[in-house]
Amino acid sequence: MSGDHLHNDSQIEADFRLNDSHKHKDKHKDREHRHKEHKKEKDREKSKHSNSEHKDSEKKHKEKEKTKHKDGSSEKHKDKHKDRDKEKRKEEKVRASGDAKIKKEKENGFSSPPQIKDEPEDDGYFVPPKEDIKPLKRPRDEDDADYKPKKIKTEDTKKEKKRKLEEEEDGKLKKPKNKDKDKKVPEPDNKKKKPKKEEEQKWKWWEEERYPEGIKWKFLEHKGPVFAPPYEPLPENVKFYYDGKVMKLSPKAEEVATFFAKMLDHEYTTKEIFRKNFFKDWRKEMTNEEKNIITNLSKCDFTQMSQYFKAQTEARKQMSKEEKLKIKEENEKLLKEYGFCIMDNHKERIANFKIEPPGLFRGRGNHPKMGMLKRRIMPEDIIINCSKDAKVPSPPPGHKWKEVRHDNKVTWLVSWTENIQGSIKYIMLNPSSRIKGEKDWQKYETARRLKKCVDKIRNQYREDWKSKEMKVRQRAVALYFIDKLALRAGNEKEEGETADTVGCCSLRVEHINLHPELDGQEYVVEFDFLGKDSIRYYNKVPVEKRVFKNLQLFMENKQPEDDLFDRLNTGILNKHLQDLMEGLTAKVFRTYNASITLQQQLKELTAPDENIPAKILSYNRANRAVAILCNHQRAPPKTFEKSMMNLQTKIDAKKEQLADARRDLKSAKADAKVMKDAKTKKVVESKKKAVQRLEEQLMKLEVQATDREENKQIALGTSKLNYLDPRITVAWCKKWGVPIEKIYNKTQREKFAWAIDMADEDYEF
């Protein structure tokens, strides 16, 4: 309580000075009238200051002021011992008020005493009411509130009651307290604490011991999925017409009709297979009466429906900030409740907690099932997966789950079977989760193991090109394509069930052309087929002579629609790969070749003397080489031409600014030669810096334009997220001083937190 004694001593000295001044007044009564008002003002200021310190001193000053007004100079003859007695009583009150006074003194600029550490029960209790804290917008009020009860438990009950009574008696204390808080600005303390909180939340699972083989988690609890909202019927003024006449549809039929109306301007609705599949499934939802009337899709008029949905879309765009904020808050509330799960005592983000709403299936490419109705998923379709000791999520009222499982050998939380392809859909964890991160890490470690034996495997398949067995030769040539061209293995599919996409094992004779010589190169194979997601793979590749001869042999006496590798399937190939190396698949080859290509390209393209924008361009070029290898293509964005025009406008404007700056520099240099003083030299230096700054800005814009042009038909993201060991990128960034934020966005940094933490600049794939 050393701070209290210092404060009390200063108060006693103030009282002594007050008494001395009154004695001085007795001797010089003529001066009293001149200075009386001035001294009253000073006394009031002292009284106000004392108010902000503690309530007891305020009462003392009030009593003094009352005495002054009543008796005039009666305080002149007060005994000093009486003052000291009052000070003693004051000290006793201060002790009784405990830490409340200490806190007030601290807030008013007094240094806190060392003994405060011995009284933690008071430290967090004396907090201003919510209405006083609210304007400060403290982000951790809730956390502090959670901590208070622990401190209150050790609080003396009598002291607590006394303090509350004192606060009620004197409401004025609250305002100075907040004023002082405003002066002190407590926010920086919160800002310092906040990063610590975030650090605590980061689970460095890669530093922990891994679970036994096959075990994915020990505890799992979640809230289940969020279902699509129920259908809202169209307003009465929005009509559907059949054969020129208004027709009122039943709710089920109307809902399916709206799916088509929403896509009315889309290319899909002009495709015959889409229209045929839609009409077939739509009729299943109609009543018998509707089926009898609606027999031809061409006679259906969805125009008013389509216009209604366009107007709704436009209205959403025109929403006020308040309306948008309200929707955002609702989404955040939903995310907070359903977007996280508890896995092994850690809060993990869920990737897709919302069930997809009903609609019309589109598919990729010319999918044979496009236009079919994706039915509404109900709770009765849902399988829940959680711990036995976890609280099972409650289904919506009036419904029940299909099944509740407790399988800790799988990573999904929720599953259901969709009706179009009969495939199983899952709700999984976010890519930044431990489970996803471990899977990625394991994938890249497997690819690194391939590096040790890839030469042996390559020698083996070269030997197999000469095998007496056709099956072995075909397998060896297919493996050569998977290795050299990063082709996917290609799965067998039922005809008519999916789009006609192929991989290496399912290539047909029609997909390749052989050229003994083409464009000055020998033994060229021309590939042309639809790969995954119906993306065209077109490539002209020079191959080794023995591969070329084998392909000629495989194509003998075959029709265009016949399989190129008729003695091979993915099962046979994958079994052979497992024999070569445990865990080896066609995807491991793709991952290995993608990562090793990135590492090699970065070494070749990165120049030590380049600035950051130039280094980023080098990185993107290395990434592009991988994307081309893996055939990660995309259609140029619709806004590409417009964005390039805007960028060129910026470049032209920057060039003009640079030309002006150079003229200014030249003029300043001429002045400096004539004037030869310090002021003109400073002007020259300033102009030089301006020119340098503009040159850097221009270079950044030009690099950006080059990058956009080169990447307009290449998808860099797919390889970056799925095939490139992130540790290669992290090591490159650390080695060349490139901020990791320039390569990975926030989501990607969360996904690759394990790589960012563990890789140093010397990492080699």
From Swiss-Prot:
Residues 1-23, 40-108, 129-166, 179-199 have a biased composition (Basic and acidic residues). There is a cross-link at residue 117 (Glycyl lysine isopeptide (Lys-Gly) (interchain with G-Cter in SUMO1)). Changing residue 117 to R: 5-fold decrease in sumoylation. Localizes in both nucleoplasm and nucleoli. Almost complete loss of sumoylation, concentrates in nucleoli and no clearing from nucleoli on CPT treatment. It catalyses: ATP-independent breakage of single-stranded DNA, followed by passage and rejoining. Changing residue 533 to G: In CPT-resistant leukemia. Changing residue 729 to A: In CPT-resistant lung cancer. Residues 1-199 are annotated as: Disordered. GO terms for biological process: animal organ regeneration; cellular response to luteinizing hormone stimulus; chromatin remodeling; chromosome segregation; circadian regulation of gene expression; circadian rhythm; DNA replication; DNA topological change. The record marks 316, 364, 412, 443, 501, 532, 574, 632, 650 as: Interaction with DNA. The keyword Ubl conjugation applies. The modification N-acetylserine is found at residue 2. GO terms for cellular component: chromosome; dense fibrillar component; fibrillar center; male germ cell nucleus; nucleolus; nucleoplasm; nucleus; P-body. There is a cross-link at residues 101, 103, 117, 134, 148, 153, 158, 164, 172, 204, 336, 549, 642, 700, 712 (Glycyl lysine isopeptide (Lys-Gly) (interchain with G-Cter in SUMO2)). Residues 432-765 form the Topo IB-type catalytic domain. The modification N6-acetyllysine is found at residues 172, 280. Keywords: Acetylation, Biological rhythms, Chromosomal rearrangement, DNA-binding, Host-virus interaction, Isomerase, Isopeptide bond, Nucleus, Phosphoprotein, Proto-oncogene, Topoisomerase, Ubl conjugation. Sumoylated. Lys-117 is the main site of sumoylation. Sumoylation plays a role in partitioning TOP1 between nucleoli and nucleoplasm. Levels are dramatically increased on camptothecin (CPT) treatment. Phosphorylation at Ser-506 by CK2 increases binding to supercoiled DNA and sensitivity to camptothecin. Gene3D superfamilies: 1.10.132.10, DNA Topoisomerase I, domain 2 (2.170.11.10), Topoisomerase I, Chain A, domain 3 (3.90.15.10), Yeast DNA topoisomerase - domain 1 (1.10.10.41). There is a cross-link at residues 103, 117, 153 (Glycyl lysine isopeptide (Lys-Gly) (interchain with G-Cter in SUMO)). The active site is at residue 723. Changing residue 103 to R: Localizes in both nucleoplasm and nucleoli. Almost complete loss of sumoylation, concentrates in nucleoli and no clearing from nucleoli on CPT treatment. Eukaryotic topoisomerase I and II can relax both negative and positive supercoils, whereas prokaryotic enzymes relax only negative supercoils. Monomer. Interacts with ERCC6. Interacts with TPRN; TPRN interacts with a number of DNA damage response proteins, is recruited to sites of DNA damage and may play a role in DNA damage repair. Releases the supercoiling and torsional tension of DNA introduced during the DNA replication and transcription by transiently cleaving and rejoining one strand of the DNA duplex. Introduces a single-strand break via transesterification at a target site in duplex DNA. The scissile phosphodiester is attacked by the catalytic tyrosine of the enzyme, resulting in the formation of a DNA-(3'-phosphotyrosyl)-enzyme intermediate and the expulsion of a 5'-OH DNA strand. The free DNA strand then rotates around the intact phosphodiester bond on the opposing strand, thus removing DNA supercoils. This is DNA topoisomerase 1. It comes from Homo sapiens.
